[in-house]
């Protein structure tokens, strides 16, 4: 069964999806998706937007049916809350605060950062902790920074099958990493962007909150419908980490004995700021 996109041209129009950038800021490669120039702005052809969106929904359906995960990427202010909420609702991964370099091309480092986050959470929750108030405060601060950057990908143990990007110009590093690894990219693309590296272009206003929400929700609904029809469980990407008991020693996980020996105090791990610096910036 092929899912259909239920959005209408009227809904796209009311969301402002047709407003492109000023004519002085356009990318000529977006010309096929432009309807006209009006008052110094390029107007996007919403008939083509709708056609591309229907193709995108079909791509989403196939990706989910194959059991592959999807990573939503949108770190600019208009997009971050929208993609976070959508990803959580449909049980997919997201990067909404900051794209960490190597999130795809150097997953081992990112996974180490996630392990550090998990370890800190266990330390903070330990009833046996002898950390001072100052040490606890420093640990809590570090936890907030790590969680802020890794919350949406902490359960992503393998590469996603598809990236859904809001504004590929703004998220060019994420797009480049996906390209290197052959991961297809679906993106909301405005008239100032280069659509060349994008596998599935959805031409639209990528600065309008209404436009972004309308289209992202259509993709989210396609994911949910496909999962329900296929019998797949919808798991929140921000669910708590479950750690086996053997990973915890005296109330604390010991991921690296040498690190523990070098940075321990009274049997408890003292986390240094030299670890996972990229995730903490």
UniProtKB/Swiss-Prot annotation:
Keyword Ribosomal protein: yes
Coiled-coil region list: none
UniProt entry keywords in alphabetical sequence: Ribonucleoprotein, Ribosomal protein
The keyword Ribonucleoprotein appears for this protein: yes
Descriptive protein name: Small ribosomal subunit protein uS2
CDD domains named in the record: RPS2 (cd01425)
Family (UniProt): Belongs to the universal ribosomal protein uS2 family.
One GO CC term on file: cytosolic small ribosomal subunit
Protein source organism: Chlamydia muridarum (strain MoPn / Nigg)
PANTHER family found in the cross-reference section: 30S RIBOSOMAL PROTEIN S2 PROKARYOTIC AND ORGANELLAR, SMALL RIBOSOMAL SUBUNIT PROTEIN US2M
GO biological process: translation
GO molecular function annotation: structural constituent of ribosome
């Amino acid at each position: 069964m092929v899912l259909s996109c239920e959005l209408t041209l009227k809904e796209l129009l009311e969301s402002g999806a047709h407003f492109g950038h000023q004519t002085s800021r356009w990318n000529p490669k977006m010309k096929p998706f432009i309807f006209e120039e009006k008052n110094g702005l390029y107007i996007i052809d919403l008939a083509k937007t709708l056609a591309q969106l229907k193709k995108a929904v079909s791509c989403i359906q196939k990706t989910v049916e194959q059991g592959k995960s999807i990573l939503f990427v949108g770190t600019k202010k208009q997009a971050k809350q929208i993609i976070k909420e959508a990803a959580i609702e449909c049980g997919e991964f997201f990067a909404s605060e900051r794209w960490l370099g190597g999130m795809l091309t150097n997953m081992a480092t990112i996974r180490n950062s996630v392990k550090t986050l998990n370890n800190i959470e266990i330390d903070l929750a330990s009833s046996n902790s002898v950390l001072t108030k100052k040490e606890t405060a420093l640990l809590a601060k570090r936890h907030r920074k790590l969680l802020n950057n890794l919350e949406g990908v902490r359960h992503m143990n393998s590469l996603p099958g598809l990236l859904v990007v809001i504004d590929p110009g703004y998220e060019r590093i994420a797009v480049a990493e996906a390209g290197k690894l052959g991961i297809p990219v679906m993106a909301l693309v405005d008239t100032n962007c280069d659509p060349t590296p994008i596998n599935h272009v959805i031409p639209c206003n990528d600065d309008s909150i209404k436009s972004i929400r309308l289209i992202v929700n259509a993709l989210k609904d396609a994911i949910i419908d496909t999962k329900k029809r296929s019998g797949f469980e919808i798991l929140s990407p921000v669910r708590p980490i479950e750690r086996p008991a053997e990973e915890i020693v005296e109330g604390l996980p010991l991921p690296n004995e040498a690190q523990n020996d070098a940075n321990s105090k009274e049997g408890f791990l003292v986390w240094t700021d030299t670890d996972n610096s990229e995730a903490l910036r």
